[in-house]
Structure formats: structure tokens, C-alpha cells
Amino acid sequence: MRKIGLAWQIFIGLILGIIVGAIFYGNPKVATYLQPIGDIFLRLIKMIVIPIVISSLVVGVASVGDLKKLGKLGGKTIIYFEIITTIAIVVGLLAANIFQPGTGVNMKSLEKTDIQSYVDTTNEVQHHSMVETFVNIVPKNIFESLTKGDMLPIIFFSVMFGLGVAAIGEKGKPVLQFFQGTAEAMFYVTNQIMKFAPFGVFALIGVTVSKFGVESLIPLSKLVIVVYATMVFFIFVVLGGVAKLFGINIFHIIKILKDELILAYSTASSETVLPKIMEKMENFGCPKAITSFVIPTGYSFNLDGSTLYQALAAIFIAQLYGIDMPISQQISLLLVLMVTSKGIAGVPGVSFVVLLATLGTVGIPIEGLAFIAGIDRILDMARTAVNVIGNSLAAIIMSKWEGQYNEEKGKQYIAQLQQSA
């Protein structure tokens, strides 16, 4: 009998979670029994993310060993991220203006959700200016950054350490071998943890549906439909078009990442798939030096799905309150989002925090966020899947742009996937 693939196992877990959550809607015991299972799975993934990023980056950077090359890669990567996320904001604004998801919605029929925790987080984040964000990329204490899980300082330290390993030549070989062994061991651990993914997905979805139910979607169904349709458009038209420019088939990327996309969608967490997408992009022909730098950095600077949603949600709230947003005000919103949406990965409820930091500056009532907080998890699932595709594509594009993409390895990997399908 043929073994059921991981994608199908996760999908079955997703469906069963929805069924259990719907049957026991409003029953707090669902969270009591299932939340620990979901939390254990998320903790297992978070446990391995930092060791994989550090070991992969050190090995990748040490193999390049050239500060000038790395600086060139970093510059190109940031430019690419800025262009794509700006396009995502524009697409979100256009979708909100064309489909008007907030027009005609009766605010009295909507439930308000407490957003105080997001407000507190936003107040903390707003104390940091853009300059401070860049200053904080350089860690004053790497162990403090490791404890907090601050990805950008960890990436900076790993790059510098990798350059140091390369610079000392023969003396650095034992260190390099240690990190190579660490990376391989952690990828093995990742594969073992992924066997637990269907159970984690079942638990997390079961808890979500039991808390919010399907009824919470009905008053805001137009917003949900517009968000999902716009995300699909962005994947196949925008990212698909960019991929085609570089000779990449977007459907190949989706096929490669099918397991990870279902998992990221179900858990609404990009972190759960970071190790696997790095591994798969290497198998697809991207060098370790590029995947280990571009993908983790993209988690802070290239959240395409999140930035698209933030623009759309901002206009939705304005429409909800009957506020007319002229072009000049929408351009201001675009410029503010270009800044506020960068560099705060790892902050809980990052999209909400960005929106809270943005709405007030363009004259939109932040209280409106309380109306969509209840369905944020459903919307978060869609934007997470888009973030995963966007960052995976970025790694391939940077590899091609740098002339380091292994075309033959990529073709062999696709052929191998087609045979096993």
C-alpha cells in the first residue's frame, strides 16, 4: 500500500481540525486539550530555526569569503525586496478601491475584539525610529539576540563570523566542518519534526475554529473574499510575471513547496517552514550562501502578503467609517507602509502592529481594527502562504541575478518530484 504524502497528511489534519472545531464551537475544553499539542509543534520548529540559520549562513558565507561579493548581494536583495513589497502595497490599494470591501458594511452587525495587547506592542515598537532599526541590526550582545530570537542581529553576526572563518584559512577548517555537521544534523531534526506536523495543524485549526466559528466570517465575507482573491492574483500575475522575467515557472515553485504551503497556511506561521524552504531552494539549485542570507532576511524585509493586506485593510477601515481617501492621502499611506512594514519580524501580530503604527498617521481611526481582529487569523493564513512563496522566489531570483543558479540541478529536482508524484 502506497504511503500517504506529507501534504495529504497535513491537509487531512486541517480538515479534521475544522470539523472538530465546528462541532465543539464555543467549548473552552477544545483549547484546553488541543492548544498544548499545537504549542509543542510550534516550539519544536522555533527550537531549530536559529541553529539552522546560523550554521547555514556561516557555511555559506565562509564558502564565498568575499566581503565585496556579500555587500553586492545584500544591496541587490534589499532593492529587490523594496520593489516587490511596494508593488504589493499598490496591488492592495487598487483591490480596495476597485472592490470597495468596506462600503455598505453595517458596523452594528460586527463584533469588536480586544486589541489592547497589539496597542501595547505598537507603543514599544514606535519608540524605535528607522535609524534605530538599522543600528539594532548590529548586536551589542549576540547571546541576548539569541535569547530574544532577533533574526537581523543573528544574521549580521553569522555573516561576520563566516567571513572570519574564511579569513583564517586552514585554522578555520575545523570550525567550518563543525557548522557543516550542525547544519546537516539540524536538517535531519527538521525532517523528524515535520512528521508531527499533521497533529500540530489539527490542534491549531481545531482551536481556531472552536473559538471564532464560521459565523464570524459572514458579516466580513466580502473582505475575506477580496483579500483571498487579491492574494491569488498577486501570486500568479505579479510574482508569476516576475518569475517569468527570470526564466522561472511559478507553478514549479508551488509544486516544490506544496507541503510547506499547506503547513504555513494551516499554522499561519512562516517560521514553521523556514528550515524546509531553505533546504528545498538549495535542492532546486540555489547556493547555500544565497538561500541562508536571502530567505531569513526576507522574513523582515519581504513580507509581500502582509504588506498587501495592510494596504487593503487600511482602506477597508476608511470605507467602514465612510472616510473618503483622496489619491494624495493614499500615496502618503503607501510611503508610510514602505517604512513601517520593514524590520519588525518576530513581533507578535506583526501585521496588526504595523497597521496600528500606520493608520493614525494618515487619519484613519485605529479603533476600526477591533472589527477585523476576530477574523485576522483567517486572513493571516492567506498572507503567510504568500510570504513563503515570495521569499522562496527571491532566493531563486538572487541566485540567477548573481549568476550562481545551478540550472541542471533545478531541472533534476523538478524531474525527481514529478516521478515521485
UniProtKB/Swiss-Prot annotation:
Q: Name one Pfam family in it.
A: SDF
MF-aspect GO terms: symporter activity
Its primary localisation, in coarse terms, equals membrane
Compartment annotation: Cell membrane
Q: Which GO terms describe its biological process?
A: dicarboxylic acid transport
Cytoplasmic membrane side: 1-3, 65-77, 170-198, 244, 328-330, 373-421
Q: Which loops or segments lie on the Extracellular side of the membrane, by the record?
A: 25-43, 99-148, 220-222, 266-306
Query: Organism's domain of life?
Result: Bacteria
| Membrane topology, from the record | Multi-pass membrane protein
Please provide the record's keywords in A-Z order: Cell membrane, Membrane, Symport, Transmembrane, Transmembrane helix, Transport
The subunit field of the Swiss-Prot or TrEMBL record says: Homotrimer.
Among NCBIfam families, the record links this protein to: PRK11283.1 (NF008440)
Protein family (similarity comment): Belongs to the dicarboxylate/amino acid:cation symporter (DAACS) (TC 2.A.23) family.
- Function noted in UniProt: This carrier protein is part of the Na(+)-dependent, binding-protein-independent glutamate-aspartate transport system.
Q: What is this protein called?
A: Proton/sodium-glutamate symport protein
